[in-house]
């Protein structure tokens, strides 16, 4: 379960441990990672080429995968490989390039880069079996999505 398991004494992984997760394919992508994606205590996630315009914002909850919710809430599938202009006031779901296969003792927290706020965008991370935005459960294995 995603919520109600958080403690306030969690630590942050330094870039060396993030690189180790990449080396062990516990964070992986079909494309090569760029060195500038790895920050002192975080990794920048990248949008993939597949997106959906959604009826509304949603969370899959602790029983469902995001992919099973897409057919229920998607209005349009979008290919982002040649660019796309997002409509203001609409909700989009974008599959990220990065996937996870985390060890049982590691969970994730996401927050948007400040540049997204300056562009007047509101983004949140969504993962399978989670009832909170911007959280990834311990030992999570699967894809990641951004809600825009």
Mark where each language-model region is.
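Non-catalytic terminal segments and appended small domains
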Residues: 1-148
């Amino acid at each position: 379960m995603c919520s109600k398991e958080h403690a306030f004494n969690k630590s942050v992984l330094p870039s060396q441990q993030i690189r180790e997760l990449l080396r062990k394919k516990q964070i992986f992508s079909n494309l090569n990672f760029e060195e500038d994606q790895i920050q002192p205590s975080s990794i920048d996630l990248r949008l993939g080429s597949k997106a959906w315009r959604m009826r509304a914002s949603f969370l899959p909850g602790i029983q469902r995968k995001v992919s099973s919710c897409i057919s229920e809430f998607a209005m349009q599938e979008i290919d982002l490989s040649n660019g796309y202009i997002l409509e203001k006031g609409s909700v989009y779901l974008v599959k990220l390039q990065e996937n996870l296969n985390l060890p049982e003792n590691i969970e994730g927290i996401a927050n948007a880069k400040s540049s997204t706020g300056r562009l007047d965008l509101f983004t949140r991370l969504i993962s399978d079996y989670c009832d909170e935005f911007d959280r990834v459960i311990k030992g999570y294995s699967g894809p990641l999505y951004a809600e825009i």
